Amino acid sequence: MSEEALQACLDRHLEHAAMVFMLDDELGTHHGLLWADFVLLTVLDAAGGAAPATELARTLRTPASHLLLRLLPLEKTGLVERAADGDGKRRVTLRPQGRRLLHEARDTAVDACAP
């Protein structure tokens, strides 16, 4: 990798970090959510409100152990539910409270992402 390519990667990372910081602040202030929580809930909602945990981890491009760390507080606050499906695998379901909060937070995210 050339120095220019490395610098381009570092610049992209810092831009991404700044965006996440701003979105964490906006969503946290108004809805008590982190950007990562919002993304997870959005992906779950787009999957029809429920998905196997392994599929969710794959879609989010995160290890299953990291997904579990994200899910535990969301489950504790009643936004999602984890349960074994018929195959003994874990299935994650977006609860009504989570769907409501997601739809409320969507306007904040749209406003924050607007140029």
What do the PLM-derived regions correspond to, one by one?
Residues L41, L56, L71-T77:
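Basic amphipathic alpha-helical segments that dock to polyanions
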Residues F38, T62, L67-L71, R82, ...:
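Residue-level detection of beta-strand scaffold positions
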Residues E3, A47-S65, L79, E104-C113:
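Short, Lys/Arg-enriched charge-dense amphipathic segments
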Residues M1-H31, T77-L79, L94-P96, R100:
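N-terminal leader segment of winged-helix/HTH proteins
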Residues E3, Q7, H31, W35, ...:
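Residues at secondary-structure transition points
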Residues L72-P115:
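Charged, amphipathic alpha-helical coiled-coil/dimerization segments
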Residues F21-H66:
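N-terminal helix-turn-helix DNA-binding core of bacterial DNA-binding proteins
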